[in-house]
Structures are given as C-alpha cells and as structure tokens.
C-alpha cells in the first residue's frame, strides 16, 4: 500500500503538523499505581509514537473525587504532574504530539475510591446497577451518588481548569475534555440521567451548560488552540443514554464553534457498548458538518473503514484503540499492508508493567 492512502496523508490541525491521520485513542490501562503515572508508561507511549503522530493519553483524573477504577492516573497533585513529565518528554523526543484526556467519573464509582469514603458526586442521586467490568470478569458495584448542589458546580468546573493547567505544566501539547461514555459530563448531557430542576437540568441548553462551562474554563486557562473534547451522544454506557442523540450532538457542535476549540472527537453510533459494533441508521455526518474545527472519529474502525472515512470527508482523523494497543507500529503496518497482531482482552487492565502493555511485537526491521 502506498503512502498516499488517505489515512497516511499529512494534516494541519491548528498549529500542529500531523504526518498522518492515525490517532492513538485514549485507553485506560490501570497501571498507574496509587493514581501516579509510572516509568513503564514512558516505553508504552514511546512505542506508539511517530514523528508528527497524535496521541491522546489515557483518561486522567482531575481531582480526588474523579476516580472510579483501580490504578488510573491523575493530574491534580504535584507528584502526578512530575510523574507525567518524563512520559511526555518521551513522546516529544520522537516527534509526537501528546494530549492529556482530563476526566471525572462522576457516579461511575463507589465510596472506596472516594476521599473519606464519601458518596461519588453526580448530576443526579440515581445509582447505577452493578455492571460487568470491561474485562468481562469482574463485577463493579457503584455507590449511590450525591447530587451536586447548584453552587458546588463552579468548584468542579475549576477542577477541570486546574487539571488543564497542570497538563500544560507537565509538558502536554493540549488537553482533551472527556465528555463521553457515561462519566460526569455525560451525566449532565444525557436526559436519561440528568433529572435536575435547576439551570443545569431540563432543556437541552441547560443539560449542556456544565460541559460548556468546562470548555470555557479550560479554553480561558490554556487557549482554545490546545483544547479538544470527546463526546458520545449515541452511546449508552453506564446507563447514560439520550432520547434525541442527534439533537444533543448538533447542539454541542454548534455551541463548541463559539469557543474555536481545536477538535471534536466523537464516538461512532455503532459503538453502543464497549467493544461491540452494531448496525445503526445513525451517522456522525451532520455533526461533523456542523463543527468547524478538526473532527476525529472513533469506534470500531479498521484500515479500510478509516481510509474511506477520510477520503469521503466524513472525518479528518481516525482514532484507533484496540488495534493501536496491540500494534505499536500501527501506522507503518497500515502503510505496507502488514498483518496485525491480535489483541488480548484479558491483559487490557492487569497491573503488569510489561505483559499486555509493552510486549506486543513490532514488525521485523527488515520488512
């Protein structure tokens, strides 16, 4: 396959010159012991770095209430910021562009992850039913959340702002606000979760208010040219569905245009559940057409799908998760049409610093 395949063409994303359009999607790996990024992440991200390639770091907690999983990284303490620096430096040493995904899980948590064993915070006090974890084995139980009071919300918005500033201090090129997959921002966006009667609930405009206040705070802090957001209007992860996902996606796309943010990263409608593709009549096209910045599509893409999505103008960039996890040299494999390593789901979330993490083979150097 020649390097003129659409996925392998250069792209100018704001001030960043990308050499290709294959993006490392944000992937939770649960190897940041005690919520602190570890030295083994240097190799993991470096392996997946190409000169001019865009990488989005795994979901990273913004505060001590943001956690809901074992050993996920944070960026709210000095220790965490310092621990990220060599990881970011490793990506930059190979010419990569690195964004930090800033995250609050909201009610997708339980009190064992919370300071002083308190209830997780959310838009609502409706609790989640126990759910099988993404590894298909463990069952997660969730504590009944505490509905945030109206006057508390600005403090949470500020946590995102501080996390964004910390990410820039750690050397990241920008941040991606995690507004997808049933986590805190999504708990405000989706009408199946948000049952508030204040200015953050009810109408579409009110449900989007929290997300847009976060965007405002983060862009004010670090500049719109360093800010992206990830959204999944069509998804129903963690019981977070919406009765009119198209309207939600379009409203957000148009509202985001006013801030001039760098990119919008959307999850395909076919990805209703983690790792499972469904046929769907829905499309991201109207949302993509409405949004004026760079558009990134994600969710179950292979090489052929990705090339078609770029060539037809359906998206600018394509984010790959599981394929990039198991193929550290994915852009090169796409370029020469090499076979792909199969991923092993059983090692996605184990604590081992090597197995299932940095031990996926590269192509032989003589290929």
UniProtKB/Swiss-Prot annotation:
Database matches in InterPro entries = Aldolase_TIM, OxRdtase_FMN_N, Oye-like
Gene3D superfamilies for the chain: Aldolase class I (3.20.20.70)
GO MF annotation: an example: FMN binding
Residues annotated as binding FMN are 26-28, 59, 101, 230, 300, 321-322
Q: Name one GO biological process term.
A: oxylipin biosynthetic process
For activity, the cofactor(s) needed are:
FMN
Q: Name one Pfam family in it.
A: Oxidored_FMN
Function according to Swiss-Prot or TrEMBL: Putative oxophytodienoate reductase that may be involved in the biosynthesis or metabolism of oxylipin signaling molecules.
- Tell me what this protein is called: Putative 12-oxophytodienoate reductase 11
